[in-house]
Amino acid sequence: MKRVILSLMAMVVAASMMAQVRPQNNHTVSTTLGAGLEYGFEWAFAGQASVVARVGMVSKDFILRSGWDNFQWSATMSPGVTLEPRYYLLMNWRDRRGKYTEGNSAEFFGVPTTMTFGKDGIGELAVSPVLGVRRAFARHWFHEFSAGADLLCMPEFVATPRVCYRIGYLF
């Protein structure tokens, strides 16, 4: 009987160690540093991959100016739609080490494609390959930081650096 119990315990431990953690489907309401408010849905599929779709008011430009005697900032928003394929890089590694992976807390590589619409009706299409870190906390909250390049494809091609900090609510 002792051998049976020990072998069952060994099988349970081995199964839990070999378990694959997958990203989770979730709905979010989030804002970026500066301006914007978006509703998003993350659909998990195929192992560590997911697709994030967001719609809402998107932060288009966030400009900081600083001088000897003043500090100014400006931000503009416009309606927009974002579709972002994501690949979570270290989710299994984090799970094997007992780290928190709830709410898709892991490092990721993503390619957000954003279409924004200005007041003159002319749209802008931006494709932005980014590396990021997402962490969930307090069960329903998350924050993520990503950096990469903004490749503005429409109306003309322009490449600029991209840094984004997002905080939001998971439900």
What do these predicted regions represent?
Residues 1-25, 167, 171:
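Bacterial Sec-dependent N-terminal signal peptides
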Residues 20-25, 48, 90-107, 137-142:
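Short loop/turn motifs that connect adjacent beta-strands in outer-membrane beta-barrel proteins
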Residues 23-37, 47, 75-81, 107, ...:
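Residues that define the transmembrane beta-barrel architecture of outer-membrane proteins
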Residues 39, 83, 129-131, 147, ...:
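Membrane-embedded beta-strands of outer-membrane beta-barrel proteins
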Residues 43-47, 89-91, 117-119, 135-141, ...:
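Outer-membrane beta-barrel strand-turn architecture
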Residues 64-69, 98, 122-123, 155-161:
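Outer-membrane beta-barrel translocator domains and adjoining extracellular loop/strand segments
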Residues 79-95, 159-171:
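Outer-membrane beta-barrel "beta-signal"
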